């Protein structure tokens, strides 16, 4: 056998030279057609559903339709630079987003990239945006209150940590205002050192004007609430895939707190725009349309998102994620496709009405149509005691007010009922950016249901409330502290409160 030394040495030299160098194998495909934010790609045979792919110019997309001969990719960005015949490569990663406390105080887009000009985000891990919701075993029934600071909601439609409560109403009825007040109301809780008390906030803006989002962030900053909040924005000028993805990204960021034994609330503002973006994508991907041209799985789109809000049991760390989805109706039509879907998924709804808004009843909550299916079990004892009475009296008032329009001669009892009801309705009004603590709400509602407002003219109710609150905060701070600490209105506290309110009522004119 003939051994050639030169040949062997050449092979050895070559192997030594290339030692440690690994060839990178990427699976690439070709763009067949592109338009309207959708690219058809040939050749990505092993791509996964929901996988991120990268185009030649660095633009990213997500593989949604896996067909026999091509892949339908939605593009996260402008499709102007993408041409037919360009290469597309797999990233082998399902769409994910950064999570952690480093995101607090920041504004990010639907992929988790910062858009607030404050530099890169400090994060340690990334999580998939579309994960399975917790099963039945890790969950626990809702048992802690999630205070919004609004009397009309905390007393009549209470929300608990881990609940999904829908905020539904026409445009310009104050849906975002309720969400904003809820975030601002968490400021005292987030000042506490205990992580079990804190409630972090995630606000997802979908399809809104950039000016509106900027204004929202400005208010959060001015009120000192941005430091415990994350804002995820996919505005009206962003592509439909970004608007579709933003709620899932926000949810993943909120789940970080839930899974680490902390508490968070997430506001989706609003899901009707996400459904419209999903409809646009589905129709362009040639998926068959259903009712109102929405695809058949639009219910599943919202159910898999909202089911991720949960209260976990002690073995899982007892964390929670509360969801406040917002839905915009057209002309108060709650029976449209998307509103009925989301109503059936959530644990109750806060129904806002244009008529009430223009009558000056703000927040414009229709107490008759609004419900909370699980929140009452999370109400504090003190609030339960006073709220039960106000619910009954308002229900009677609504019934009588309808009849009173026809008859002019009303008996004294009916007149008394109408008188009390109109004053309680006045009492539930609340200006924006002025959330009340639980103990303050209890005292004010107690005064209303115990007849201290009955003799007042309607236009003096607000002044009475303000005066009573400043008296309680000043001279009776110990009473407020007792109610806050015990979460109950004991007979002793009720007697002290009665004496304080009676004394104030005598001096009030």
From Swiss-Prot:
It catalyses: ATP + H2O + 4 H(+)(in) = ADP + phosphate + 5 H(+)(out). Keywords: ATP synthesis, ATP-binding, Cell inner membrane, Cell membrane, CF(1), Hydrogen ion transport, Ion transport, Membrane, Nucleotide-binding, Translocase, Transport. Its main location: membrane. F-type ATPases have 2 components, CF(1) - the catalytic core - and CF(0) - the membrane proton channel. CF(1) has five subunits: alpha(3), beta(3), gamma(1), delta(1), epsilon(1). CF(0) has four main subunits: a(1), b(1), b'(1) and c(9-12). It is a peripheral membrane protein. Produces ATP from ADP in the presence of a proton gradient across the membrane. The alpha chain is a regulatory subunit. Belongs to the ATPase alpha/beta chains family. Gene3D superfamilies: 2.40.30.20, ATP synthase alpha/beta chain, C-terminal domain, P-loop containing nucleotide triphosphate hydrolases. It is found in: Cell inner membrane. GO terms for molecular function: ADP binding; ATP binding; proton-transporting ATP synthase activity, rotational mechanism. The keyword Ribosomal protein does not apply. This is ATP synthase subunit alpha. Coiled coil: none annotated. SUPFAM superfamilies: C-terminal domain of alpha and beta subunits of F1 ATP synthase, N-terminal domain of alpha and beta subunits of F1 ATP synthase, P-loop containing nucleoside triphosphate hydrolases. One of its GO terms (cellular component) is proton-transporting ATP synthase complex. Its EC number is 7.1.2.2.
């Amino acid at each position: 056998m003939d051994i050639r030394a030169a040949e062997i040495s050449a092979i050895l030299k070559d192997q030594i030279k290339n030692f440690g160098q690994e060839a990178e194998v990427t699976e690439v495909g070709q763009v067949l057609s592109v338009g309207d934010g959708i690219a058809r790609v040939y050749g990505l045979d092993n791509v996964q559903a929901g996988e991120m792919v990268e185009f030649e110019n660095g633009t990213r997309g997500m593989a949604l339709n896996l067909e026999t001969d091509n892949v339908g990719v939605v593009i996260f960005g402008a499709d102007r630079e993408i041409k037919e015949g360009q290469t597309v490569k797999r990233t082998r990663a399902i769409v994910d987003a950064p999570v952690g406390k480093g995101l607090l105080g920041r504004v990010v887009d639907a992929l988790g990239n910062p858009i607030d000009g404050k530099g890169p985000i400090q994060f340690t891990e990334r999580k998939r945006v579309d994960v399975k919701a917790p099963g039945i075993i890790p969950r626990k029934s809702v048992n802690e209150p999630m205070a919004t600071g609004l009397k009309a909601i905390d007393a009549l439609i209470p929300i608990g940590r881990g609940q999904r409560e829908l905020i539904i109403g026409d445009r310009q009825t104050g849906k975002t205002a309720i969400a904003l007040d809820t975030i601002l109301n968490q400021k005292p809780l987030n000042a506490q050192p205990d992580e079990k008390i804190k409630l972090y906030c995630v606000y997802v803006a979908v399809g809104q004007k950039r000016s509106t989002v900027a204004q929202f962030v400005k208010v959060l900053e001015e009120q000192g609430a941005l430091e415990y909040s994350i804002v995820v924005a996919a505005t009206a000028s962003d592509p439909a895939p970004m608007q579709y993805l933003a709620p899932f990204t926000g949810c993943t960021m909120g789940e970080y707190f839930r899974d680490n034994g902390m508490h968070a609330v997430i506001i989706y503002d609003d899901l009707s725009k996400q459904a419209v973006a999903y409809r646009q994508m589905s129709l362009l991907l040639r998926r068959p349309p259903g009712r109102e041209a929405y695809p058949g799985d639009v219910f599943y789109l919202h159910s898999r998102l909202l089911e991720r809000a949960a209260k976990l049991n002690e073995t899982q760390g007892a964390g929670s994620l509360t969801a406040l989805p917002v839905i915009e109706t057209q002309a108060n039509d709650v029976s449209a496709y998307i509103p009925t879907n989301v109503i059936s998924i959530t644990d109750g709804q806060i129904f806002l009405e244009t008529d009430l808004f223009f009558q000056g009843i703000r927040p414009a909550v229709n107490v008759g149509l609004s419900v909370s299916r699980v929140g009452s079990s999370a109400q504090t004892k003190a609030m339960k005691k006073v709220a039960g009475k106000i619910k009954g009296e308002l229900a009677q008032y609504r019934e009588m007010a309808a009849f009173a329009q026809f008859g002019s001669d009303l008996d004294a009892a009916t007149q008394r009922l109408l008188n009390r009801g109109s004053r309680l309705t006045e009492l539930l009004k609340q200006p924006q950016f002025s959330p009340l603590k639980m103990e303050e709400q209890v005292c004010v509602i107690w005064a209303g249901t115990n007849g201290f407002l009955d003799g007042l003219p309607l236009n003096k109710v607000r002044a009475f409330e303000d005066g009573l609150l400043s008296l309680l905060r000043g001279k009776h701070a110990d009473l407020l502290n007792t109610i806050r600490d015990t979460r109950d209105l004991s007979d002793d506290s009720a007697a002290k409160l009665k004496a304080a309110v009676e004394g104030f009522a005598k001096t009030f004119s």
